[in-house]
């Protein structure tokens, strides 16, 4: 299969490429062989330069050719189905055919039972490197036979998405080959030279839209070239059967920013650690070349990205989260949801240039719309999942606050209980002390030959003495007596000041203490029933 792919997958390249001479005989040699799947051999025989040489160099533009020569060793190719008309001036024809590398994604059975078909279709982007070099040498019959061969390949995987019918006035032909892969029908818009240089990397299947290795391949479209493509091809009407995304005529700047956001998305620190499991079987070594190239493409695309208004941080925010999930994609049946969640993560964290692809502005005609995208069906669910996660986190924080409030309440209750216990213990101590004082007062009254306390209560018939409340009266008496002495001192001091001025006779300190005691006894008799009622 991989050898047949060499003729199935011609990609955009000029006919008279200098490096393509050594690859001229290989596609014919591979076409004569039986259909076999050799991934490691194909991956090892093709050097990274073969991968990078997909970037077309037009001799008409030496400046751009020099720039592409400087960068072609860094850029892995981007593959998309574009069938432009033959350039009459140049006299050569550029045709690119691609299958969706994520065909196995919806059906995990392909990994084991139908490995030949899936691997061959997955292998196509890297297997056709030498066919890329001799694109100009392929005749029309070879192209038609390659289309028919790809039809046979596509019929093995007829479970995949099939919506590939584009009717446009400018379209030369849209073969039914593209039942699985992305289709970009690049219309003639005056400058095919820029179209050649940009290897029609505008279209990537939405299923693998943010997979690291596919983005590594898409990064072959440098921002400068993508700017030229988007500026020169306004009537770009492309459908992606892989994801059902329909691109209406793009505004050049916004399409460039969105496209470059996907190509720049692979230029992150995680690019060196691309997961080949996402696109190819685990034993495939072709993506190692792609990984190295994409790690190099990070150097070339990122500096020129300000021209096309695509920030490298758009993909860099979302990319480190990709490899962890991407390794599970081929083996699990719910890998589509993982990729969709990856897409939503990258879209939610990207700048406004690529946020326009998601549900922020789904109705604008100049942004990418994907109403029929299989991933778009899961976008609201994944967004709602993130919202529910945020809500659950908030609920957890609220519960924690409630727990804290409950803990504080328990602390307050404990403190209140301790205060109540201390009050109770102090009350008991007070009672004990009052009983002791009562006994002392009673003993003193008996020693003095009195039948009453100093406050005037009877020792035997005092009703308050039974509740140990009368003792406070004696204490109060002592306090009042001390207070009277204190007031006497204060009055003496206050009168000493006017004495210096008018020297009036001080009469208040000379009052006899006997009436004071009688008044205190009267007050205590009146108040004795109110004191210590709480005991």
From Swiss-Prot:
Residues 411-448 form a coiled coil. Residues 255-269, 292-308, 329-365, 374-388 have a biased composition (Polar residues). Keywords: Coiled coil. Residues 309-323 have a biased composition (Low complexity). The keyword Nucleotidyltransferase does not apply. The keyword Coiled coil applies. Residues 24-52, 215-388, 492-529 are annotated as: Disordered. Residues 235-254 have a biased composition (Basic and acidic residues). Residues 503-513 have a biased composition (Pro residues). InterPro entries: INSYN2. Signal peptide: none annotated. Belongs to the INSYN2 family. This is Protein INSYN2B. It comes from Homo sapiens (Human). The gene is INSYN2B.
